[in-house]
Amino acid sequence: MPWRAGNGVGLEAQAGTQEAGPEEYCQEELGAEEEMAARAAWPVLRSVNSRELSRIIICNHSPRIVLPVWLNYYGKLLPYLTLLPGRDFRIHNFRSHPWLFRDARTHDKLLVNQTELFVPSSNVNGQPVFANITLQCIP
């Protein structure tokens, strides 16, 4: 994953590595009953192990400094470096890895494609998927 605070290594450099998600953790060590109990304890909102790459362009259309946050395989929130207003960046990510976007100063929720959660989809005809970040409209 690029831009992760303190990481310094982009996904392009990590594309050949394999990360084991929770779905691979207990299969050999636990029996069926224990595995079901372990799965029940995992967060519902988390990344799932996917080998399908998705090219993404994250665009900050808000006047705020944006903090992108990736939910890892265990549901832990991992913040990345901030994105200035009017700027964008391109990343290679994996399909079904969820992202949230927050105001870097206030931690207010920001919308991405008019919803609170962004889950990359498959690229169609080789075109990147856009994640357009905007402010919430309060009625």
UniProtKB/Swiss-Prot annotation:
Tissue specificity note: Abundantly expressed in the placenta.
Region of interest (Beta-domain), residue spans: 54-135
UniProt-annotated stretches for the region Disordered: 1-22
Pfam families (alphabetical): VHL (PF01847)
SUPFAM superfamilies reported for this sequence: VHL
Database matches in InterPro entries: VHL_beta_dom, VHL_beta_dom_sf, VHL_sf, VHL_tumour_suppress_b/a_dom
Subunit structure, as described in the record: Interacts via the beta domain with the ODD domain of HIF1A. This interaction is independent of prolyl hydroxylation of HIF1A.
Note: Has little or no E3 ubiquitin ligase activity as it lacks the alpha domain required for nucleating the multiprotein E3 ubiquitin ligase complex.
Function: Functions as a dominant-negative VHL to serve as a protector of HIFalpha.
Protein family according to the UniProt entry: Belongs to the VHL family.
Protein name in the entry: von Hippel-Lindau-like protein
The species this protein was found in: Homo sapiens
